[in-house]
Each structure stands twice: as structure tokens, then as C-alpha cells.
Amino acid sequence: MKRKWEATLKQIEERASHYERKPLSSVYRPRLSKPEEPPSIWKLFHRQTQAFNFVKSCKQEVHVFALECKVGDGQRIYLVTTYTQLWFYYKSRRNLLHCYEVIPENAVCKLYFDLEFNKLANPGADGKKMVALLIEHVCKALQEFYTVNCSAEDVLNLDSSTEEKFSRHLIFQLHDVAFKDNIHVGNFVRKILQPAFHLIASEDEDMTPETTGHEFTHFSETPSEQGTCFSKMSTDIDVGESQTSNSEKLGRLGSAQQSSPDLSFLIVKNDMGEKRLFVDLGVYTRNRNFRLYKSSKIGKYVALEVAEDNKFFPIQSKNISKENQYFLSSLVSNVRFSDALRILTCDVPQSKQRVQCFSRTGTSVEAIEGFQCSPYPEIDQFVLSLVNKNGIKGGIRRWNYFFPEELLVYDICKYRWCENIGRAHRSNNIMILVDLKNEVWYQKCHDPVCKAENFKSDCFPLPAEVCLLSLLKEGEEFTTDTTADTETKSPHGPSSSVLSKGAFSDADWDNGIDDTYILEATEDAELAEAAENSLLAYNRMDEIPDELLIEVLQE
């Protein structure tokens, strides 16, 4: 009896020691003593589009993250939560450590890079030196094309290298500067790496280089023929002057190409011995999944950590830990609007064509000068109605979308009436800001005096027909109608059993699969629903769930 008791006591002591080393995670509950903590929102979705629709209907600032489910099948479920709540659980729950930020389509974002090469295929490559040279080259390009000053101290350098592969993520922390979206980031990166493309082409005449990510396959146009233009955000000149500015940038680009920098250090070999770039150019696609700080790929054991040669150190805050600050800095789409923020663009010719959707008369509008519709064309039309009155025909020069705040910022041209001074500015343009979460719009302007006063007009309600819930409802009705039509025309489409297997590649998930087919798979969302229900139940309980106890005991 005594031996049995001693064995039981020893087992209890071992468990107590285990829990001291690995304590059970508590439940996230915002506290009144910390008003900065957002309410609890933790919702899982089987489809990415459902997750984004929920974000748009949510009044809180929430974000979409992708969680890998199983090794090898490429399937992911999508989590919607706040940065604060994700970090609360992320610190202690292993099942969250295969997590990706979903960089929203059209959203303002940071400049970022994904770097990798096979060490065995490149025995002489010095990864750290290559990273330093790349950062130096990018900083020079930012200064030359956008007059943006930065250095290695403004670059968060994350490492997930193994004995076989060198792997880094670079996220630039530019001061009051961001890119219009990650497509513009990709255009900029491809442009500044042109000398490396040409070098590969000259070394192998049988290969036409292209920058599709992991391999070189096709790059049909020279830099001058491609006509990509660089322009910084001009907020106090009208369209004609903006065109001149762009021409000057192109001239500088041409002169820079005549004395191309040596980018031979960027050329590496894959495991087949084929030449490719050190920079992965496949990470600049819409709704891109980009691995989070401290996450590893599922089935792998090396997470993204701060690199030994990292020179970026976040500003210390008494309310936020250093690790949390690194986490927030690593988020590519974590950019907030401010009057001082400059938005950088890098367009290709296709996006410089005049776009009919902005025209209220059915003809192209010169004032728009080719900027495409925002994600909400109905709101574009509403904004145009605000600046087309009293005989003045204003236009939208450009728009920028801030995903965290669901804020659309429209730069207006040919309409300068300012509520602050009660008349039109003589030379400075205005902005119309549409707050989609709060369903209001207001005016700010680029005039230095108004900026110094931090002027913001009164808020005015959006018409009901352009509010997000109304637009989402219309979108759902359209999708339903389209699905019904597709089912009529294609009765032999793929079955839900086939679609529910989840054997999709990363590329499939990144590029998106036709919603009309995936709608059938919603019946097979038990995985997401079960996970969601368990998490919701977990958040409601004060006691520790049995499932969590079992999981901890088995580790």
C-alpha cells in the first residue's frame, strides 16, 4: 500500500513539475484596466472568401490568417481574429505555430522579400553577405526612385535556415512610407532586379528569363520596352504635373540602367543545377499567404526567428513585450493611415490605361488618369458624386485601401473645396476618406495649414446602398445566381466529395479556386465547424477542458 502511495505521489510531483515548465494557457479575456485590448473574436472558416466577408462585416479591427491543417495536402483553414488575441494564444499553443498572414488584395503594405537557396547546390554562397548586399541595393533603389532614405537598421531580418537550405524573410520598416499593395511591391522588385535577369539570359542564350518565383521561364520584354514607371505619391500637384514627374523618373531609370549594378551575387543554382534568383518572386500575388514570425511549415521544425545579423530593433514600449513588437513589425499588411504617410506605386502599362468604371457619362475621365476601380466601385461612384457639383467636374486621381481600418482614401483632383476654410484651395487638393466599418465619410486635405491643424471635417453617413453590409448582401445574391446558372449549364461538375479532399497545392490556394465550384464544398466544412465549436466552448469555460488536459499529458 505504501509503495503504491509513493508511486502515486511521485507521479503527481512529476505532473506538477511538467505544468510548471509548460503551464496551461489561460483564456483570453480583455480587461478594463487595459483599454487597448480588443474584444474577443476568434472565428474559423473553410474558405478564404468567407473569412474576408466576415472581416468586412465586423466592426472591430480583425485580420485573416491561414492555418495549415495536414502535412502534404496543402489544405488550410482561415482564422479571423485581432493581432492582440492571436498573440495571446500564439505564445503558448503549438497548434498555432504553422500560421500565415494573408496579405489582403489591394491593401497598402510594407516592402518584403522571401529569400532562399539550396546550400548543397551552392557550396560557395555566403548567405549573410548576399542578404547584406541585397539590402544595400534595395536601399539605393528606394533613394533613387522615391527619395526614401533607409538602411539595414530599417529591415527586420528573419531566419528559418536549415543545414540544407538558406532561408530568410526581409520586411522593410520604412518611416511613414508604404506601397499601394503587394502587386506594386512585386513590380518594384522585378524592376530593380532587371540586371540579374539580363545576366542569366546572357549566360544562357537558350533560356529566356522570367521571374515567376522559384524558376526562370519567361521574361519577354526589356526594361525600356516594358515601360514600368516609378512614381512617389504626389499629393499637392495635379495630373499633368504628375505625368511630368513620372517621365522624369523614367529618365532616371534609363540612365541608371546604362550603368547597371553588379547583381551576380543574386544568381544561385537549384538542386537540378539550373540558375535562378536568390529572391523568390512568387510571393507578390493577391491574398498571398506569408509565414508568420515564429511559425514553421507543417511537418518542419525550423521556425522564423530573428536572424543573428538582424539590425532592426523595435522601439521599446512598456505595454508591449519585445517579442510582441517583433511580431507586429513582421506583419506585412500592418500599416495604418496617417497624414504623413507616403504611398509608393510602381505600375505596368496595363494598369495605366483609362478605366471606364470611373466615368459617370460612359466616356473616359481625364482626371482619373488611368487608376483602376477600388475594391468597391459603388463607393467610387458615390465619391465622384460628391466632387461633381456646382458646375465643377472633379475626379478621383487615385485611391489607397488600408485593410486594418477598412479605410478607403481617395485623392481628389479638379475639386478643391475645403470645409475648414469654407472655400476652395487655390493650389492644394483634398482627400475624401471613407470609413467602411463606421459607415461614414469625411474630408481632409493636403494644404500645409490644414495639415498643421490636423483638420478633419465632420463625419457624414454613407448612403445605405453603399454600406458594406448592403454590398456584401448583393455580392452573395450575385454568387448564388451565378452558381445556379453554372449548375444548370454544367450538371456534371466536380462532386463535393472530390472537392472536400483538400488536396490542393499552395499555388491553388494562393491564386484562388473558382467560387462556383467551391460552394459545393461548404457542405463538407465539418473540420472548420468542429474546430470553431471547440474553441468557442473553450473560451466560455472557466475550468480547463478535458481535451486540453489529455493533449498536454500526451506531449
Swiss-Prot record:
The modification Phosphoserine is found at residue 255. Mn(2+) binds at residues 114, 116. Residues 219-230 have a biased composition (Polar residues). It holds the Pfam family DNA_primase_S. Substrate binds at residues 76, 114-116, 165-169, 288-291, 297. Its cofactor is Mn(2+). Residues 480-555 are annotated as: Interaction with RPA1. Residues 210-230, 480-503 are annotated as: Disordered. DNA primase and DNA polymerase required to tolerate replication-stalling lesions by bypassing them. Required to facilitate mitochondrial and nuclear replication fork progression by initiating de novo DNA synthesis using dNTPs and acting as an error-prone DNA polymerase able to bypass certain DNA lesions. Shows a high capacity to tolerate DNA damage lesions such as 8oxoG and abasic sites in DNA. Belongs to the eukaryotic-type primase small subunit family. The zinc knuckle motif binds zinc and is required for the DNA primase activity. It facilitates the binding and selection of the 5'-nucleotide of the newly synthesized primer and the recognition of preferred initiation sites. This is DNA-directed primase/polymerase protein. It comes from Bos taurus. The lineage of its organism: Eukaryota, Metazoa, Chordata, Craniata, Vertebrata.
